[in-house]
From Swiss-Prot:
It holds the Pfam family FBPase_2. Pathway: Carbohydrate biosynthesis; gluconeogenesis. Belongs to the FBPase class 3 family. It comes from Streptococcus uberis (strain ATCC BAA-854 / 0140J). One of its GO terms (molecular function) is fructose 1,6-bisphosphate 1-phosphatase activity. It catalyses: beta-D-fructose 1,6-bisphosphate + H2O = beta-D-fructose 6-phosphate + phosphate. This is Fructose-1,6-bisphosphatase class 3. Keywords: Carbohydrate metabolism, Hydrolase, Manganese.
Length: 638
């Protein structure tokens, strides 16, 4: 401890420097807490996600109305458009107004933006706001923001700054800088509760956007974990992400943006597979050429077969996973082209019998082994993909505890009686929090050793994708094989873990919270399963202890949910859950045709505004203040 205070004294070599820091930290502790945003199941839907960030899930419009009560709705809407999409709005207005009239309009609205920055930034220190300013305009912006009531002399000073900005044709850029500053000030901390990846085309764009946030945490989803697994050396995870990309016409992500060449795999698929209707890509309203559809069809067939071969190998070498029910090749009657699962025999459709060596059905050919090794090399040497997975590892985990909220993506595996379901690995049984901690440890260990491809830690990725006691999956089994090769849909059924019924019960939720060291005032924030709001399901369950925030941001789920996602907002006044309408286009926003907010629900309101000192970060600041104060009073001892 003595060494700690000696090092602290090196940082603060005088009592006056200690005093300054204590006063600064104490002042921060008495500010209102920053606004936290919780989103889940982004599924690669970049434009809709980006729009939510730009408008802070409707909070910016609400604050504009508070800041400018005298303005009519038309003025508020125009300000919103300028703040959400400043560059696009300026370009659109230039077409309509011409350059001179545009400059006049920007000059008219710029004071409003400056006033609104002061309004939204009022609960932050000047230092924090200063750090958000873009380097090119930091001095100008700080000068324009500094004085609350500039005197007559300062008025001319400000006018001179603006006149020079206009003269140098920089008003557009300054305007954009203020709009983007408002966006940054509106979201203090972002929580992403899983599944950045899935059927949407632009998870890479989402990850680039997330990397720009100073305060962010991520809870891995089941789709995210397979991408991490691919980079960590799992052949089956790698093939799975290619298969899903082919299924949803997202191959451009892998080939063009991550720079991973799939040519040899495509040639393999074209030489061995003919078109099968069940493997046609799911297009979500898109139109593609027949030749492109054929490529995706054949590619999906090839990756599916490779996946099932690799899965059989994994199940055999990991009996502790308890996945023997997935050994389906042995249940196939090749003569009658049927499969028997349980007591029922089903005819097989579109199954590639001619591609199988029935003496060694899960064995890979030399061609297939070479393909997999080449693909793994290209995946692991994709610079951008590696950066994105590094980010997921750095900011992510199986769960996160923040300010009395427990965040996890999928479920807490349970028995029907409410006991935590356990899994035995080695000689140790894991359940509850210990199970999630164990999974996370294995993921991190595997990520450190990407040259290992069939070790226990690497195989855990596949268990997390589809294992019965995986907290990311939450079902008894995954029926991918059956969905492709068996027409009878009764074979496609996947039974959810009892958790999904039990989470309606407050007592169960309190038991989960207690497992993670939280009290009965805490909340669980959960994603993964879309809330069927149009069918009457509610996202707030168990007397407010459980909040489900997967509302169908992905287009494919919106027919089921009736909405397009949720944002949970935690500010100094309490908790609010916002449901969204589907996002249409940037053009519709600029024309005032898209207001994404659908329903707002107040989850919880606090009697007194929550201050920074009452948050997790605040507790760290109070500890720091106590240490500084001790050093201040014992300065000469160190």
């Amino acid at each position: 401890m003595s060494q700690y205070f000696s090092l602290l004294k090196e940082k603060f070599p005088t009592k006056s420097s200690l005093l300054t820091e204590m006063i600064n930290l104490d002042a921060i502790c008495h500010l209102p807490k920053g606004t936290e945003y919780f989103l889940s199941d982004l599924h690669g839907e970049y434009q809709a996600f980006d729009y939510l960030l730009r408008n802070a899930s409707g909070s910016i419009k609400k604050k504009l109305q508070e800041c400018f009560p005298e303005k009519d709705s038309e003025d508020i809407d125009k300000l919103c458009q300028y703040i959400y999409y400043p560059s696009e709005k300026i370009a659109a207005q230039q077409e309509i107004l011409g350059e001179k009239a545009l400059q006049e309009e920007l000059s008219f609205y710029l004071p409003d933006l400056i006033q609104f920055v002061k309004y939204t930034g009022s609960k932050y220190t000047r230092s924090k706001v200063r750090k958000m300013l873009p380097a090119d305009y930091a001095y100008i912006m700080e000068e324009l923001l500094t004085e609350e009531q500039p005197d007559k002399n300062k008025h001319f000073y400000y006018q001179a700054i603006l006149a020079k900005v206009i003269e140098l044709e920089q008003l557009d850029n300054l305007f954009v800088a203020f709009a983007q500053l408002i966006q940054k000030l509106s979201i203090d901390h972002l929580h992403i509760v899983g599944d950045i990846f899935d059927r949407g085309k632009y998870p890479d764009f989402i990850l680039e956007r997330l990397r720009s946030f100073r305060n962010i945490d991520i809870q891995w989803g089941n789709h995210d974990i397979t991408w991490i697994g691919a980079i960590s050396g799992s052949y089956i995870c790698m093939i799975n992400v290619i298969r899903i990309a082919a299924r949803y016409n997202s191959i451009d992500l892998i080939e063009d943006r991550y720079g991973i060449n799939l040519r040899r795999l495509i040639e393999y698929s074209q030489s061995h597979f003919q078109e099968e209707d069940v493997f046609n890509p799911i297009l979500d309203g898109e139109e593609i050429a027949d030749s492109e559809r054929m490529v995706l069809n054949q590619l999906q067939q090839a990756t599916a077969l490779l996946q099932f071969k690799l899965e059989h190998q994994l199940i055999k070498r990991r009996p502790c996973f308890g996945m023997e029910a997935g050994l389906l090749f042995s249940k196939i009657d090749t003569e009658n082209q049927t499969i028997t699962i349980g007591d029922i025999t089903y005819p097989l459709q579109s199954f590639p019998f001619e591609m199988m060596d029935w003496d060694n059905p899960d064995g890979l050919t030399e061609e297939e082994e070479a393909l997999l090794k080449g693909l793994m090399y290209r995946f692991q040497n994709s610079t951008l993909l590696k950066e994105h997975v590094d980010f997921l590892i750095e900011k992510g985990g199986m769960y996160h505890i923040s300010n009395n909220h427990l965040l996890f993506h999928g479920c807490m595996p349970m028995h029907s009686n409410g006991d935590f379901k356990s899994m035995v690995f080695g000689k140790q049984a894991y359940s509850g929090r210990a199970l999630l901690d164990f999974f996370e440890e294995q993921v991190l260990e595997s990520y450190k050793n990407p040259d290992s491809h069939e070790d226990f830690q690497t195989d855990i990725f596949w268990y997390l994708w589809c294992g019965e006691v995986s907290s990311l999956f939450g079902k008894d089994r995954m029926t991918t094989f059956e969905r492709y090769y068996i027409a009878d849909k009764t074979s496609h059924v996947e039974h959810k873990n009892p958790y999904y019924k039990l989470r309606e019960n407050e007592e169960i939720c309190l038991r989960i919270l207690e497992e993670f060291g939280l009290d009965k005032s805490a909340h669980i924030v959960n994603g993964h399963t879309p809330v069927k709001e149009k069918g009457g399901e509610l996202p707030i369950k168990a007397n407010g202890r459980m909040i489900i925030i997967d509302g169908g941001l992905a287009k494919g789920y919106q027919k089921t949910t009736g909405i397009a996602g949720y944002t949970l907002i935690s500010n100094s006044y309490g908790l609010e859950l916002v449901a969204h309408k589907p996002f249409s286009s940037v053009q519709d926003v600029l024309e005032g045709k898209c207001d994404i907010i659908f329903i707002k629900r107040l989850v919880e309101i606090v009697e007194n505004r929550t201050l920074v000192k009452e948050t997790d970060n605040g507790q760290l600041l109070l500890k720091e203040i106590a240490d500084l104060e001790y050093l201040y009073h014992h300065f000469d001892q160190f």
